[in-house]
Amino acid sequence: MTAAIRTQRAGSWWFPGICLVLTGWCANQYVSLIGWYQQHRELSEVAAFLVLASYVVGLLPMLVFAGSWADRLGRKPFTLLALIASIGGSVLLMLGAQAEMWLHAGRVLTGVGMGLAMVAATSWIKEVSPGASGAVRAGLCTSLGFAVGPVISGALVGATWNPELAYLVHAITAAAWLVLIAFQPGTPRREPVQQAVQGTSAQGLKIFNRLVLPMAPWVFGLATSGFAVVPALTGRGAGASLLFSTITVAVTMGLGALIQPFARRWDRPGTARLLVIGLLTAITTYLVMIPVALTGSTALGLVASVLAGCANGILLLGGLGQVLALAGPGEVGKLTGRFYSVCYIGFLIPTLLSLWRLFADPLYFILLLGVLCVLSLVCVLSNRTLLAVPKMQPVKSGS
């Protein structure tokens, strides 16, 4: 490979990478405004978290189906669609000032854009990145988008008391990048026969199902625990100040992004080290949340957000790294979609907590999360030896 080609390959990952940042920005821009909507748009806690969770309605179908489409038809068309959906999501959120249903519609379309980006843009980055750097780049861009979105929206709303302005800023920025990326070359589409030959091995699927999926819900489970559960436990859930909400999101998602370059150094090929470290950090997070639930301490809550962010970043890097290493070249999008679809189970934790609080003490909800996290760790430790088994021949794409 010539130096010119290497330079082109190294530089081109920025185009889908920025798409992940922009769709992640859109996905989380509502997060820091949850308390603001409760205070100034008179949404109940349950209603505000249902708006947050409605995002999953648009996201999951894209994660389940769009990966295979992108594997066959190429990454670029679906990356462009991701940006278009993300722009549409921000536009619909702007209409939320008129009726709550537009908030739900905007969040659903935002989920469509994020789901498309997660499978198509992540796979695009993988294809133009050498070695294991694809997972680091994709994970970092995703986390960076999740971090900057709520900070920008929180800052703009804090200064103007106008969330519609925050959504407009995102829509304009994403539209500008859409025009730019439209003129960049994409990855080639794969023929059905080629895709079948380049499928994931049976051993790879076994590792994915037994080792990766059990830890996947905690990737975003820890993220939402840090920026949504912590304000609820400190007594600031329904009346959380915009500043406190923005800080918890910035701390959680910011550390999720910042820790990934360091966590990469802790990894060892052929091991589940990052998954174990991430789950141990997650368990520690929920241990710290126990006194937060008992005392409502803001200081301890911020410590929990720090730990949650670290766990999120480590688990995202470790899980995505395993997925991209296991997936056959013709099924990168498909396996990535499966991984993220399970990751987003954790996104429902704040909504479940808001419903739990109607009937029981939130302390027991935190204890339950901790126990489930321990069970995931046991599952990972029990199956980590599968990584030592050589990968066999790929199975057909339809499996």
Predicted segments with their positions:
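Central cavity-lining transmembrane alpha-helices of secondary-active solute carriers
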Residues: L50-G67, M118, A250-F262
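Conserved MFS/SLC helix-loop-helix module at the cytosolic interface between two early adjacent transmembrane helices
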Residues: L60-A99
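Cytoplasmic helix-loop-helix junction between adjacent transmembrane helices
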Residues: G106-T142
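Helix-loop-helix hairpin linking two adjacent transmembrane segments in secondary transporters
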Residues: G131, V136-P185
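Symmetry-related core transmembrane helices of the 12-TM Major Facilitator Superfamily/SLC fold
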Residues: L165-A182, F365-R384
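Transmembrane alpha-helices of Major Facilitator/SLC transporters
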Residues: S245-R268, G278, A282
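C-terminal transmembrane helical hairpin of 12-TM major facilitator-type secondary transporters
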Residues: A272-L317
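A late C-terminal transmembrane helix in Major Facilitator Superfamily
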Residues: N312-I314, G318-P362, L369
